[in-house]
Structure formats: structure tokens, C-alpha cells
Amino acid sequence: MKPRVMILLGSASDFRIAEKAMEIFEELRIPYDLRVASAHRTHEKVKAIVSEAVKAGVEVFIGIAGLSAHLPGMISANTHRPVIGVPVDVKLGGLDALFACSQMPFPAPVATVGVDRGENAAILAAQIIGIGDPGVRERVADLRRGFYERVRRDECQVLNSIEGSYYAPLEVEMPPIGDKVPSDSQDDPMVSVIPGSYSDMKIAKKTTMFLERMGISYDLNVISPIRYPERFERYLEKMENVKLFIAISGLSAHVTGAVVALSDRPVIGVPCPLKMNGWDSLLSMINMPPGVPVGTVGVGNGGNAAILAAEMLGIYDEKIESRIKRIKSRSVKF
């Protein structure tokens, strides 16, 4: 049995975060390996681990680190496989590590998840593997239904504890949870790119430009889940066979949250600097609750979103893999 995921820790103290990821991989039956290597103190060891892991067939890397958290970025600089970054709360509430993971230069993206969210890193890794492995995708769908059931149980506990005289609960009929895993079609685009508004189009066009140059088919639709919720859901149903989503949004960044709530495909988030220099959308995208990860890139970095999409798709597509290798080796310059 060979590992499909490599987990690298910046220090042994990060193991408590890795345990969350390992529990998910055990449940999903995805083989993994784990090593401890510092980007600053054992630079050559990191490079050696990444190189050997790629040769051994590892499909996804997870870098877990706190403080300056350069480990995920260093992994990305040395591989064409997708890298997920988990910032760890050591100081400053983990914000230092969060910025270090997400704000990577082109073309070295890190799909950053929330602070200490090892479980979301594992789920995102499984979603990426599920692009070309229907069995893994089905198990991820089952896992997500388990999170739904957990919320239902928590609600029952809360409601059963209410003793107020004026508590008047309504009867709410809940819709069934979808369990259909759609079949792929050759006619469907690989990627759906969803800007939340026309003000996000400049970044969206940069994203699609790189997708086109890497030969990745896509659909582009400007639609807001806040202004047009029903239309948004209909569009997601139409795009059920895409392999991944890229959501581009500023402000509270509801687009990414809405997409990941309605699809089990990987979601890449691109925060836009409409207000607060993009801090609001960056934090809203990254810090998702357990079970619904968004792999977030740097503020306004549509190019890195496209590169990350290519890294994910390249696991199962040799042509895309070849193109992303050339880009990351700097033999091709856009």
C-alpha cells in the first residue's frame, strides 16, 4: 500500500492538528504518510521528502505549520502536485501563519484552509483525489452526510433543553439529503468559475486566461447566492459534473460558502480586495467550519487559482500535468 497523501509538519508540536487529518483519512480509507521537517531548519530534508513522495505516487501534500509557516509554500515550490496549507495557532491567533500560507506568489499556490483545521485539509485532499476516483468521492459524500446528521443531533439536544413558557416551535419539513453521485460527461467543462459580481471580473478574466492557456475547459457565470439564491442553486445543479469550482468574491465572500455547501467537488476561493484590502473576504473564505473546506489562495490572485486547478486536474490528466510542470519549472512564461 502506497501513500496517496503526504503530511508534513513544521514541528512535532503540530501533531495535534495532524491527528485531525489522520482520523479523516482512516475513515475514508485513504493511505497517507507523515513526516516532520522544518522549512527553515531542515530545508534540504523538505526538498528530499517532496521529491521522493512525488516519485512514489503521492497525489496531494498537506503542510501544517505555525508562526511564519513557510513550509507549505516551500512544498509548493518543489512540486507540481496540489499543496494544502494548515496554519497553526501558535501566536497572533494563527493569523501570521494564515497569511504566510495563503499569500503565495505566482505560480506556487497553497490551498489554505482555516486555522488548526486539519480535518478540513484532509477532506479537501480527499475531494481532490475524488476528481478521478469515484470510490473516494462516494466516501466523501457519506462523510459530509455524517456532518449533517451531527448538526441535527446537536439541534435536538438544544431544543430538548428549552423550557420556556412561550417557546413555540414550528413544524419544519426538511428536504432529503441528496445521495446521487453524478456521472462524468465528456461535454461538461472541467472547471466552473463563479465571480460573485461584475466588480470581480478583472480577477476572473485573469483566472480564465491561464485556464485557457493550459487547455482547461471552463464555464464562467457571474451570479450571487445572496441576490439570486434560486438562480444560483439551479446553476450549481447544471454544473454538477464539473471537476472543481473556482469562486471569486469580495466582502463577506458568500459565493465560496454557498458552493461548498451545495457541492462535494473541490472549491478554490479567490478573495477580492473590495474593502479592507481583502481581509474580510480572505478570512471569510478560509475559516470554514468542519466538513466544508475552501482551498483559498491569496487576495486577488486569480493566476494562482488557475495553477492550483491545473495541479488538481493534472493528477489524472497527463497533458495538463505536462503543462503545469513546464510552468512551475519556469520554462514557460506567460
Swiss-Prot record:
The keyword Isomerase applies. InterPro entries: PurE_ClassI, PurE_dom, PurE_prokaryotes. Signal peptide: none annotated. Pathway: Purine metabolism; IMP biosynthesis via de novo pathway; 5-amino-1-(5-phospho-D-ribosyl)imidazole-4-carboxylate from 5-amino-1-(5-phospho-D-ribosyl)imidazole (N5-CAIR route): step 2/2. One of its GO terms (molecular function) is 5-(carboxyamino)imidazole ribonucleotide mutase activity. Its EC number is 5.4.99.18. Catalyzes the conversion of N5-carboxyaminoimidazole ribonucleotide (N5-CAIR) to 4-carboxy-5-aminoimidazole ribonucleotide (CAIR). NCBIfam families: purE. This is Probable N5-carboxyaminoimidazole ribonucleotide mutase. The gene is purE.
